């Protein structure tokens, strides 16, 4: 367990960061990504608020980016022309380099909640301003389908609706705000990597489509996000695009394949003194919310996943925090929501960074997909790949372990549209009288060089980046999953 002294240091770090942010807004923007999360004092210190993070967005329009790209759970920052900068050695011209490959991994955009309050919802969710298309077509011959879409409705005669939620949405599903955020996300990527850096091809079918690789989970959330983002990247393209997916039962993202050891390791992680301490210091909050929303079950009380998800989805789509259906004067307060969000951040940092089993847990959950990323990087290094741009649409449960594998300094819950950009450059020292070029890498998290236990990954040999990730790729995942 972290000592009282460590907790005191975390408190001092928190106060110092808040004071620093008042005098240096540019520095404060990046500080919002790296709170002192290693002690539970971060959760209980109400003066921290959201640690500069944003938890609100308009209902039916795209989110507005902040000037300095602060942590925004509803629509995480991403590379865009206004804030993008070249790697320092390239910017100061000590190295002559060109970008040759981009591996881009992102979470889907904002959505409705997975978790509906057990006592029912006092506000309806509306999604009739979005069409969730549901159709197939023959690959080469055959009649063209009618492009049907799903239109959710609430039937007042359905008795189960009383303790559920009225409206025209599925739970979860992408919202119009999420779709528009995705479109802007793609426009910004195109402006940086297609127009400014001339890496992404002007059309996805260039060189018979061999320059790009598009991947997603089997979820409608990631597929719908891909449609919006890729329209932003290629606004003039008017043909279908393949979005590659593995079979859901063996998918290497979104915990697709069965692995009994995963739950065993997670159980061990959530049985530690540190984990129990965070439950102890939040007991009063959890009891209050459980009583208010009839949520006194293990799935709602054993961690903050469900309450965070419910509150985030409301605030990120223009709704209010929930009130009890039995007594609408009893509502979740802003202060309670902020503590829920801080606890959620603490949990994510603990799952993927701060517990003794983090390496094995990452191997079990995300090791195979990390292996896919590394194989892409190695193929570029070896000159055997035609790819210049790979884009994967995944989930927070994929982004978190990848950030953990990179050794991120502190891990807040990866918000909607959170993204990791692995940039690979070929370059040589300007001062050297040689034509030899080496491969270098930079890793951006939400548009800026990631801060890690290895330092800021803004310009390192590609081989060093591969070495950082390699320990998280299991040699034999089947045996590892069967081990106890």
Regions found by a protein language model. Give the residues of each.
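Fungal secretory targeting signals
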Residues: 1-30
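Signature for phosphate-centric chemistry
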Residues: 27-213, 217-390, 394-484
């Amino acid at each position: 367990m972290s000592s009282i002294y460590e907790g005191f240091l975390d408190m001092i770090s928190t106060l110092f960061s808040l004071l620093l942010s008042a005098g240096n807004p540019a520095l404060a923007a990046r500080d919002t990504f790296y709170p002192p999360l290693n002690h539970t004092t971060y959760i209980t210190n109400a003066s921290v608020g959201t640690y500069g993070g944003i938890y609100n967005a308009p209902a039916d329009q795209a989110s507005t980016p902040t000037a300095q790209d602060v942590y925004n759970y509803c629509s995480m920052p991403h590379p865009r022309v206004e804030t993008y900068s070249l790697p320092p050695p390239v910017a100061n011209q000590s190295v002559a380099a060109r970008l040759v490959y981009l591996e881009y991994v992102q979470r889907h955009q904002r959505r409705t909640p997975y978790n509906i309050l057990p006592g029912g919802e006092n506000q309806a969710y509306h999604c009739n301003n979005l069409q969730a298309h549901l159709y197939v077509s023959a690959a080469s011959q055959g009649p063209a389908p009618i492009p049907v879409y799903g239109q959710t409705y609430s039937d007042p005669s359905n008795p189960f609706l009383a303790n559920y939620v009225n409206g025209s949405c599925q739970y979860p599903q992408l919202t119009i705000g999420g779709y528009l955020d995705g479109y802007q996300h793609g426009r910004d990527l195109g402006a940086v990597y297609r127009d400014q850096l001339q890496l992404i091809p002007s059309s996805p079918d260039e060189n018979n489509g061999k320059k790009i690789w598009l991947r997603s989970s089997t979820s409608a959330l990631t597929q719908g996000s891909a449609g919006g983002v890729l329209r932003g990247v290629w606004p003039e393209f008017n043909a279908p695009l393949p979005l590659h997916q593995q079979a859901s039962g063996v998918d290497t993202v979104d915990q697709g394949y069965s692995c009994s050891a995963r739950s065993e390791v997670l159980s061990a992680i959530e049985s530690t003194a540190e984990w129990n301490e965070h439950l102890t210091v939040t007991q009063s909050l959890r009891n209050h919310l459980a009583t208010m929303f009839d949520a006194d079950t293990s799935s709602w009380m054993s961690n903050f996943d469900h309450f965070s998800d419910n509150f985030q989805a409301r605030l990120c789509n223009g709704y209010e925090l929930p009130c009890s259906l039995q007594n609408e004067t009893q509502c979740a307060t802003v202060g309670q929501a902020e503590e829920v969000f801080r606890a959620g951040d603490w949990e994510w940092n603990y799952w993927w960074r701060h517990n003794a089993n983090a390496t094995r847990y990452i191997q079990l959950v995300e090791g195979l997909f990390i292996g896919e990323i590394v194989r892409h990087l190695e193929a570029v290094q070896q000159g055997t790949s035609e790819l210049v741009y790979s884009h994967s649409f995944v989930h927070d449960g994929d982004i978190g372990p990848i950030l953990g594998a990179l050794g991120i300094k502190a891990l807040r819950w990866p918000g909607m549209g959170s993204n990791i950009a692995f940039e690979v450059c070929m370059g040589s020292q300007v001062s050297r009288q040689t034509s030899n070029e080496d491969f270098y890498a930079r890793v951006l998290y939400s548009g800026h060089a990631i801060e890690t236990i290895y330092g800021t990954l803004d310009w390192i040999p590609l081989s060093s980046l591969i070495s950082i990730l390699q320990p998280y790729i299991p040699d034999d995942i089947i045996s590892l999953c069967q081990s106890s």
